[in-house]
Amino acid sequence: MKLRSFLMVCVSALAATALVFAQQNDDFSKVQIKVTKVSGNVYMLEGAGGNIAASVGEDGIVIVDDQFAPLAEKIRDALRNLGITDKPVRFVINTHYHGDHTGGNVPFSETSTIIAQDNVRKRLAEGSVSGIGNGEGRKNNPAPKAALPIITFGHDLTVHLNGEDIRALHFPAGHTDGDAIIFFPKSNVVHMGDDFVRYGFPFIDIDSGGSVQGMIAGCEKAIAQLPPDVKVIPGHGALSNLDDVREYIKMLKGTTAAVEKALKQHKTLDQMKKEKILAPWEKSSGGFINSDAFLETIYNSLTGHANHRFLRHN
């Protein structure tokens, strides 16, 4: 599978059918799990899909997100190889419901308790529509029962493990409507899920309750509430800090203001694309979301349109 197609599967593969597609068509045998110590007892794991945070200590292990099912044993091995504990992963906290962050829920559910915000369970259980921002949407079938979180929360939840009061905080209407950032206060590390990414323009899943306004608000809330020297694990990309988040917010606000200005001038979406109104931020289009796709996402977010013009049913 070509890289662009793989990334689109990683970010937009939602629930059971899309996960099966990804697992059958990508060779996960070649994926290696890279482990980086972040701070305290928190580590960052990179493989395929979203970044994983892991708190590893004498009480056991809690991980944030779990990538894809075929990687579950590799993730377990990477954690065991740290030599800190032989205890299993006790808890998995999902930052949101997309398949590249929840794809390992089924194998991890055998020994772990899955935790997520209320809307994550709802969307996994019912199946959802997702649009990339290029006018296409996908309707996914419900996830298997084993993939569903068995503990859910509305606004926040705390897990007391390894000397940490690990806090999951709901950030509504950002990347999706079920987003949560996970803060490890003693280690001074936060996992921000896909509300903050380092691959270029972000994917905002409007069809799943996300919005550019909510993403900006969530990132600003994180900066206001977190310690200034906190280490930031993004949903995708390199380990970061709050200055990186500030630059990200600056890009989101600038692109949004450009679209708002064009809307006030009664310009159509096609006119905005032809005029390349996001050209000043072109350096941010290095990922799989190009400037036209991100422009359409902002336009749809501001005007209340869905991201998809048609649905592809699996």
Q: Where do the protein language model's features map onto the residues?
A:
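Divalent metal-coordination and catalytic microenvironments
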Residues: 41, 55, 65, 79, ...
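Metallo-beta-lactamase
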Residues: 60-62, 68-70, 158, 165, ...
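Bacterial N-terminal signal peptides that target proteins for export
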Residues: 1-11
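Cleaved targeting-peptide boundary
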Residues: 23-29
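Active-site HxH/HxHxD metal-binding segment of metal-dependent hydrolases
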Residues: 28, 80-158, 177, 257
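Conserved beta-strand hairpin/beta-sheet module of binuclear metal-dependent hydrolase folds
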Residues: 33-81, 180-184, 189-194
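Extracytoplasmic/secreted envelope proteins and their assembly/folding machinery
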Residues: 52, 72-76, 86, 105, ...
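Accessory terminal helices/loops
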Residues: 14, 18-23, 224-229, 238-314
